[in-house]
Design a protein with these regions (language model features):
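N-terminal strand-loop element at the rim of the active site
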Residues: 11-12, 16-74, 150-153, 237-238
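A conserved mid-protein helix/loop that constitutes part of the nucleotide-sugar donor-binding site
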Residues: 23-34, 198, 202-221, 238-244, ...
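Short His-centered aromatic/hydrophobic patch
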Residues: 91-98, 115
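A short, active-site helix/loop in glycosyltransferases that binds the activated sugar's phosphate group
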Residues: 138-163
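Nucleotide-activated donor-binding/catalytic signature segment of Leloir-type glycosyltransferases, i.e.
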Residues: 244-260
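Short hydrophobic beta-strand element within catalytic cores of glycosyltransferases
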Residues: 296-299
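Conserved acidic donor-binding segment of nucleotide-sugar-dependent glycosyltransferases
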Residues: 311-322, 330-336
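A charged, aromatic-enriched C-terminal amphipathic alpha-helix characteristic of glycosyltransferases
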Residues: 336-367
Length: 376
């Protein structure tokens, strides 16, 4: 597969545009950048500085240009300058895509956008998001959706060319000596107060779209179990104080852990992974990590969950805390079902795209858009 510009004089130069607000898309861009650089593509990642601090795009061989997560004139001008002489621009997420549309105004540079999830908003902001979606979909040369639902949405919104994207779960990046410093699961469980009781884990920013309210409502049911399961939630966000008040006021068996950099280790120590709401995330990172780690998953049917996990999880209707609570209780009481889900999860995960396949698909789109077209 080619990695050269249409003129064959120098290697293809791409600009990846990222808002930095979504862990899944940020990890995807890091993985994509590493794969493209390894294939001879020059990659510039335009993202907030904190995103590079976390995901180390420069360590993947890309150039990082700090562009704030904003559509103000200064940010758009910085992005426009970074896109000068780019063979193509690839933006990830709705807001980053809209900034790219503004920055490329008047230029003929091909624009690829990947929709990793569906943006959520209410009231007047919801109307604004629909307008942004329409502008981005109609302007982009190609829209890649990470689920068939997102591809259909892009087409309905006016995309000229919408395709299903192969998006792999990037392998965890380990720092030197990381394995030696990993605490055993028993130690983590003891630190969390989960010895002699089931440990359930959820991950996600503490906002209104992650289903944490449903999770707390379900936890009321679990108070009556013996032993009482402990639910831990890794993540931070604007609803933390409100959720903590409910936990304290109702004495719920839930701990908010805040931001953690050991989510993989916590998940390996858990008996169940819980996904009470997708938050618009089409390919839930937690769901993928749970199946890879052979941790049974209970999830609500939101976003692209069924398409992602198939029959390898307990799936319940959204907005139904009683059904969610019952599914958790059933699974904790049925070790044979839990073991079956582990095996089904391993099988399901084996069919997901690899990082190499993800890079190959993206590079084929790049080549399609930058290679000279035959004269007819």
């Amino acid at each position: 597969m080619s990695s050269h510009s249409p003129h064959g004089q120098s290697s293809l130069r791409t600009v990846q545009v990222l808002g930095g607000g979504n862990a899944g898309s940020s990890a995807h861009v890091r993985s994509l950048a590493a794969g493209l650089v390894a294939r001879g593509v020059r990659v510039t990642v335009c993202a907030p500085g904190e995103a590079d601090d976390t995901y180390d795009f420069t360590g993947a061989g890309a150039e990082h240009v700090h562009v704030p997560r904003s559509s103000d004139p200064g940010s758009v001008a910085a992005l426009r300058a970074a896109c000068t002489d780019a063979d193509l621009v690839h933006a990830h997420g709705l807001h980053a895509s809209f900034r790219a549309v503004l920055a490329l105004g008047g230029r003929r540079t091909p624009l690829i956008v990947t929709w990793h999830n569906r943006a959520h908003a209410e009231g007047a902001r919801a109307h604004l998001l629909r307008l942004l979606e329409r502008r981005v979909a109609r302007t982009a040369t190609v829209v890649l959706g990470t689920t068939s639902d997102l591809v259909d949405r892009a087409r309905r919104t006016g995309a000229r060319d919408a395709r299903l994207a192969a998006v792999a779960l990037p392998r965890p990046r380990r720092t030197e000596g990381h394995e030696e410093s990993e605490p055993p699961p028993s130690k983590l469980r003891a630190e969390l107060g989960a010895m002699g009781r089931p440990l359930c884990m959820a991950v996600g920013s503490l906002d209104g779209h992650r289903g944490h309210g449903l999770l707390l409502d379900a936890a009321r049911v679990w108070r009556g179990l013996d032993p009482v399961p402990l639910v831990v939630v890794a993540g931070e966000g604007p609803q933390r104080a409100e959720l903590q008040r409910q936990i304290d006021g109702e004495e719920l068996p839930v701990r908010l852990l805040g931001r953690r950099d050991d989510v993989g280790e916590l998940l390996a120590a858990a008996d169940l992974a819980l996904l009470p709401g997708g938050g618009g995330e089409s390919r839930s990172v937690l769901a993928q990590e749970a199946l890879h780690a052979r941790v049974p998953l209970v999830a609500t049917l939101t976003g692209g969950v069924r398409e992602l996990v198939g029959d390898a999880a307990e799936l319940v209707p959204p907005h139904d805390p009683a059904a969610f609570a019952a599914a958790v209780v059933r699974l904790l009481d049925d070790p044979e079902r839990a073991e079956l889900l582990r095996d089904l999860g391993t099988r399901q995960a084996a069919g997901w795209p690899t990082e190499d396949e993800t890079v190959a698909q993206v590079l084929s789109v790049y080549d399609e858009l930058t290679q000279p077209q035959p004269m007819i």
